[in-house]
């Protein structure tokens, strides 16, 4: 039986000032240790789901709703236990900073958990080293670059020892190079620490790297599956109003021209290499 760190059943949520559900009766699961990406347009309900998984919001619309995180069912009594297991990195790290220096900010969550001073110093040093920000521990967060700020935000999450990290559009304010570096860092941290990643984004090219994709539209879950399964379904992509990543655009055009593309060719790099090999045989 597959070990799911998150199980969601019949999740619905409507904000008090709205008559339309932000999330409308959706069910899904997130395998432990996986990278799952939720895609959809602005206003589709993505960030609402992030806040529901972390207990920032509590669902009341549907009595059948179940949110289970790491074996704990979310209720008003258990939401703090859930928050010990889940960390969220938001779009704008400035909104998360509370400390005067980088090390103070990373230590904030530990202070709230009454961690001893000596243990706190060890943890702060370790997580800043993991995100390559140890040289900036005495710096003021406001003077860091966008990528550096996200690294500090990630360190603050790592410090509390979560099982699940939610990336809520956390690379959307970075340039392409900065985005690539942060995503690569998170992948390395995932492998090193055995983390589960739940990435919320409208960047289709980011979603290609996931193990599993969820497609959301107007609060409804349209589909779930591997990136290959999602992006090879052109009808689904069109109905969700999404664009195909460059790799799939090129691949689909080649297939239409009756050029066979092996299943193992699943990235731009592999496609370029394969086409070069084909060209050399002509």
UniProtKB/Swiss-Prot annotation:
Residues reported to bind ATP: 40-47
Keywords on record: ATP-binding, Cell membrane, Membrane, Nucleotide-binding, Translocase, Transport
Lineage: superkingdom: Bacteria
Alphabetical list of InterPro entries matching this protein: AAA+_ATPase, ABC_transporter-like_ATP-bd, ABC_transporter-like_CS, ABC_transpr_CbiO/EcfA_su, ECF_ABC_transporter_ATP-bd, EcfA_1, P-loop_NTPase
Membrane-related topology note: Peripheral membrane protein
Enzyme Commission identifier(s): 7.-.-.-
ABC transporter domain boundaries: 6-243
Top-tier EC class: translocase
Main localization, broad class: membrane
GO molecular function ontology, one term from the record: ATP hydrolysis activity
ATP-binding listed as a keyword: yes
Localization (cell): Cell membrane
Gene3D superfamilies assigned to the protein according to its UniProt record, in alphabetical order: P-loop containing nucleotide triphosphate hydrolases
CDD domains: ABC_cobalt_CbiO_domain1
Role, per record: ATP-binding (A) component of a common energy-coupling factor (ECF) ABC-transporter complex. Unlike classic ABC transporters this ECF transporter provides the energy necessary to transport a number of different substrates.
Membership in a protein family: Belongs to the ABC transporter superfamily. Energy-coupling factor EcfA family.
Protein name in the entry: Energy-coupling factor transporter ATP-binding protein EcfA1
């Amino acid at each position: 039986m597959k070990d799911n760190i998150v199980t969601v059943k019949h999740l619905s949520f409507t904000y008090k000032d709205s008559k339309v559900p932000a999330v409308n009766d959706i069910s899904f699961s997130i395998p432990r240790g996986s990278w799952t990406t939720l895609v959809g347009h602005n206003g589709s309900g993505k960030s609402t789901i992030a806040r529901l998984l972390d207990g920032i919001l509590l669902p009341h619309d549907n009595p059948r709703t179940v949110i289970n995180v790491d074996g704990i069912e979310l209720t008003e009594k258990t939401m703090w236990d859930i928050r010990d297991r889940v960390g969220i990195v938001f779009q704008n790290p400035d909104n998360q900073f509370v400390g005067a220096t980088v090390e103070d900010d990373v230590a904030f969550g530990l202070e709230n958990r009454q961690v001893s001073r000596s243990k706190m110093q060890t943890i702060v040093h370790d997580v800043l080293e993991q995100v390559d920000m140890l040289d900036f521990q005495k710096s003021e967060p406001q003077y860091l670059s966008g990528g550096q700020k996200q690294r500090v935000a990630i360190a603050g999450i790592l410090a509390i020892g979560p099982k699940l990290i939610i990336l809520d559009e956390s690379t959307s304010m970075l340039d392409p190079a900065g985005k690539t570096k942060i995503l690569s860092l998170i992948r390395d941290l995932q492998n090193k620490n055995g983390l589960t990643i739940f990435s919320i984004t409208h960047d289709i090219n980011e979603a290609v790297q996931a193990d599993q994709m969820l497609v959301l539209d107007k609060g409804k879950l349209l589909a779930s599956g591997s990136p290959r399964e999602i992006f090879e379904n052109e009808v689904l992509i069109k109905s969700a109003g999404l664009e195909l990543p460059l790799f799939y655009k090129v691949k689909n055009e080649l297939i239409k021209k009756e050029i066979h593309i092996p299943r193992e060719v699943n990235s731009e790099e592999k496609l370029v290499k394969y086409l070069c090999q084909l060209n050399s045989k002509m």
